[in-house]
Amino acid sequence: MVKRTGNGTDAIDGSRKRGRKDLRSIRRARNDKEPVEEPEIPVASEEDGELSEDSEEDATNEVQEQEDSKEKAYGALLTILKSEHPEDRQRERRKKKQDLQDPSSSDDELSEDEKGEVEANLVDTPGEEEPQSEEELSEGDEDESEDERDPFESHFNMQSESIDSLDEAWKQKKIVNKSGKIRVDDDESLIYTKTLAGKGQEFELPSHKGHLSSYPLKRKLKIQNNLLESQDDVLTPLQRKIVDPIFQYRDLLYEYEDYEQDEDEYRDLYVLHVLNHIYKTRDRILKDNQRLATNPDGEFLDQGFTRPKVLIVAPTRDTAYQIVSKVIEKSGLDQVDKKSKLRDQFFEDVLPPSSKPKSFRHTFKGNTNDFFVLGVKFTRKAIRLYSNFYQSDLIVCSPLGLQLILENTDRKKRQDDFLSSIELMIIDQLNSIEFQNVSHLFTIFAHMNKIPKEQHDTDFGRVRMWYINEQAKLLRQTLIFTRYVTPTANFLLNGKCRNIGGRWKNHHQITGEQSSVSKLGFRVRQIFQRVDLGGASVVDEPDYRFRFFTSVIVPSITKSTGYEDGILLYIPDYADFIRVRNYLKDKTTILFGDINEYSDVRQLTSTRSLFQQGRIKVLLYTERLHHFRRYEIKGVKSVIFYQPPSNPEFYNEVVRYIGKSAFLGDTDLNISTVRCVYSKLDGLALERIVSSKRAAVLTHGQNEIYEFK
């Protein structure tokens, strides 16, 4: 028998120019010594118990690694504070920044205009503030006092003893997490987790009223958004579920259900929160300026190291355009600088072909460019788009765009000081970002809320102490919105969010009727086989899965009583794809081909054609390729899932390849099979495929094989 190997991707050319395409993938070496490109997806999960208590030592491992860098940061801060000649230092710093080059200068895909914009916005120059009259400062705010019951005041002016206590518990690895759950719908619950400094501290669930009227908004926002009268009836059911976590400044991971309606609804709410936060921050500073004028010896701690306070991370320019447009709409400001430029660079009125699935058409509509960093500055009367990053209140970016600034190949040109004082971070459409390069998101978290390396005209007499003490991460609010919760999403919430106010996440109870296996539209044998991990750790899971594949699945392919050809092997992880491909090439005589997200058009076309003709018996197919292309692969008679798809829609789309073959008379549904390999760590994906109750049985039941039809 002639053996066919993979098509052209056996070796990765290390000499290629390191452009934007390379930055979308991560290189690492596996046991077979071959370079591997894959999204780096750590695994984590959170139990849904009514009340649980555990000590999360794993989440604190990074604390010890940061001790050395903290000492250096404090040293740099003391040097700045003791500087006798700040004018000379500032002139020298500006001279250096005039020579700053775009971090993406090695990327030949970026236009000169894009490079110039990034370069210009990184140069820290003194901003021109609008002169503020006394009437402007008090206009519309006569009924707005600094109320301690306002979450904005109570959260950011929290007693330092509470912050110091929790900070020390993190450092000493003595934190304790306590959780509780409330039901917000027949099939949806909200789970609240709070990190405490010790077991003796009391735990109680925060209030969940579901009313916007419970939270004070700036008067100009009420007027612009018709909220002067009743504010309760204006909220949708989805908004009532998340309004309290958002406006109480708690972290939130929310899994929504509808691509169009739900995204629009949660954006309406968080944009209102963003504007309220920015307006209150700026008004507080301006009022304190007046107080200082009459009382020069007064102490007013109301600032961070730098001006930017909000960071919104989005996958594409189209999503960013929708977000910024909503910010403009709800701001109550009529003057918007460079609005036409925003439309020219971010908006495209295009849609993918109607033959593609609805989710694909939504994800890839409009401008799908994933490189952008946009500064937005607010004054009393105007919004200034494309503002200098250090003079911006809001920064909207893609992971790739910010990565090229934070991780410049020239270490001297790297910058992250503009992220030092972020108090509100929002990740929109995490499900799409995960299919880009999720490691860029981890890079952003690593650079957040660090003590800046330079002064940036900071008035240290007004910097809050928890900034000076490098405790800003404990006050930062992080909001994450995703279509499907994955281990990556849980890892971000549990491992990267340390909000002293605690964190919320929702959980949907998937019924049998809502599961993927019930929505196929035809009957076919679906076999789920569990990999026994024993007492193995999460790190060892890929090895156990691979051994199961080579010892159980491969023999079933060679000795199958069903079809010998038309076998589609679906592999979600690119590292697993490389490993399986090498094994089939070196250790078996199976005729196979492979297509992945790095295959060129010619290879994609020829390999699919050979598979349809039966000249290739097995076709290796990656999840990222399916996400970006949604091919209609012909000639599929059986499907093997190396791991359950993270997106349940992918399960149905791939299995329906068999249904289309049966419709054309190329296969018999009584002979065709679908085989899915899973472990107990795949519970999140299994829930959406087989339902919540069945997933619990599959992951913890006595049997290791379950069949559906």
From Swiss-Prot:
Biological processes, Gene Ontology terms: maturation of SSU-rRNA from tricistronic rRNA transcript (SSU-rRNA, 5.8S rRNA, LSU-rRNA)
Protein keywords: Nucleus, Ribonucleoprotein, Ribosome biogenesis, rRNA processing
Location relative to the cell: Nucleus, Nucleolus
Keyword Nucleus appears in the UniProt entry: yes
Entry keyword annotation includes Ribonucleoprotein: yes
GO cellular component, one term: small-subunit processome
Entry-linked Pfam families: Utp25_C, UTP25_NTPase-like
Region entry Disordered, spans: 1-156
Compositionally biased spans, kind Acidic residues: 37-66, 105-116, 126-150
Listed GO MF terms: rRNA binding; U3 snoRNA binding
Lineage top rank: taxon: Eukaryota
Gene3D superfamilies reported for this sequence: P-loop containing nucleotide triphosphate hydrolases (3.40.50.300)
Stretches with biased composition (Basic and acidic residues): 22-36, 82-91
SUBUNIT field: Component of the ribosomal small subunit (SSU) processome composed of at least 40 protein subunits and snoRNA U3.
Family: Belongs to the UTP25 family.
Record protein name field: U3 small nucleolar RNA-associated protein 25
Organism: Zygosaccharomyces rouxii (strain ATCC 2623 / CBS 732 / NBRC 1130 / NCYC 568 / NRRL Y-229)
